[in-house]
Regions:
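C-terminal hydrophobic helical "lid"/dimerization subdomain
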Residues: 1-3, 171, 217-221, 229, ...
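Glycine-rich beta-strand-centered segment in the early N-terminal region that forms part
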Residues: 20-36, 46-92, 124, 129-131
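Short glycine-centered segments of the SAM/dcSAM-binding site in methyltransferase folds
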Residues: 79, 159, 254-255, 282
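NAD(P)H dinucleotide-binding glycine-rich loop of Rossmann-like/cofactor-binding domains
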Residues: 88-163
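Mid-domain Rossmann-like dinucleotide-binding core that forms the NAD(H)/NADP(H) cofactor-binding site
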Residues: 131-216, 221
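Glycine-rich cofactor phosphate-binding loops and adjacent beta1-alpha1 units
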Residues: 152, 197, 201-281, 345-346
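Residues in the short beta-alpha loop(s) of Rossmann-like NAD(P)-binding domains
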Residues: 189-192, 262, 289
Length: 346
């Protein structure tokens, strides 16, 4: 079967390609994609990556059309979200219970999730009901927020500073509150602009106690006005350039969790290692691979403990995608999460 999907590179150079999905194997499923969210990684590819065209999209939901002969967990007609990278269940780490360390990962084999159809090992499919396909497309980034806050080991009633007010930063801030953080600050940029005000407003709606404009003030100084000893946990969802500021915000014996990425040389930053050593700061890298916590994320979206309407601000089709990505990167529209409908019904 043929599918049509999106591939992109710098600067917002998007190609719509037709490609062959191949035969449906005994463990595979064919999904008609109904909604696919635009991730910060996709935006990074479109802004910074000049090495090749990258398959776009990994935050997707859809309907099962066909299954292989050995598939038992889903059936045609089921609504599903897709774990973009799933644990194999067979390697030593998986069998010893260290699923998060699996390196024999099951994925989409280089196919874009921003596509009409998606073929994948059915092991990656998680059924859902009770929410729209668009809301369900938030499952993957919300699961990243759950992973980040779990890996950060936030103390009950503790203080958290989140760098970044994009979708992942906002999910992290909300999850930190749900995990019992007593104080959450969100650091971003763009105060006084529609783009920044939209995101800071969302942060406050999701429970943030303080929002900080990172370009206009010393972030650590602002944090220490409220938390003289620094924050218990600092979580970086913004580009790596802010990691030194994140360390400055952290208390003695605290933890800095880093999941923000960048490309094109922007991933290399200077860091005062002595400050980390003498202050006994734990710096931890976090990546939500393999995907975990999808069922928890679905439950949070269904209950509206995490409200999908706060996040999805814009909808696009294949025809409007490229221009809208330019608008987002140039902050011409106050977007938080853009959702692609590759098979629009209207």
């Amino acid at each position: 079967m043929k599918a049509v999907g999106l591939f992109g590179r710098k600067y917002v150079n998007v190609e719509r390609r037709e490609y062959d999905l191949g035969e449906i194997g005994p463990n595979d499923a064919l999904v008609e994609v109904k909604a696919s969210g635009v991730c910060g990684t996709d935006l990074n590819f479109l802004r910074d990556s000049d090495d090749c065209f990258h398959p776009l999209g990994h935050e997707l939901s859809g309907e099962v059309l066909e299954i292989g002969s050995c598939v038992r967990n889903v059936k045609p007609g089921d609504k599903v979200v897709i774990e973009d990278v799933a644990a194999c269940g067979c390697c030593r780490d998986c069998q010893e219970g260290n699923i998060s360390l699996c390196r024999s990962l099951i994925d989409g084999e280089g196919r874009p999730g921003m596509a009409t159809h998606y073929k994948v090992n059915a092991h990656c499919l998680v059924p859902f009901d009770g929410i729209s396909f668009e809301a369900a497309s938030l499952t993957e980034p919300l699961a990243v927020g759950i992973t980040a806050t779990q890996e950060s080991d936030i103390p009950f009633g503790g203080s958290v500073v989140v760098f970044g007010h994009g979708p992942i930063g906002l999910f992290v801030a909300r999850c930190a509150k749900l995990r019992g953080a007593g104080f959450v600050a969100v650091v971003g940029m763009g105060t006084g602009t529609p783009f920044g005000d939209k995101r800071f407003g969302a942060a406050r709606a999701l429970g943030a106690d303080l929002t900080i404009e990172g370009r206009k003030v010393g972030v650590a100084d602002e944090v220490r006005k409220v938390l003289p000893n620094g924050a218990d946990r600092v979580i970086v969802t913004a580009p790596p350039v802010v990691v030194p500021d994140a360390v400055n915000c952290c208390r003695f014996g605290g933890r800095v969790s880093v999941l923000g990425l960048s490309f094109g040389g922007h991933e290399v930053v200077p860091l005062n290692v002595n400050q980390i050593v003498f202050n006994k700061i734990d710096v931890k890298g976090v990546i939500a691979e393999p995907a975990m916590h999808f069922r928890q994320a679905i439950d949070l979206l269904k209950s509206k403990a995490v409200d999908p309407d706060v996040f999805i601000t814009d909808y696009v089709t294949f025809d409007t995608f490229e221009q809208r990505m330019r608008d987002v990167l140039e902050q011409k529209i106050p977007a938080i999460k853009v959702c692609l409908r590759p098979n629009p019904t209207e």
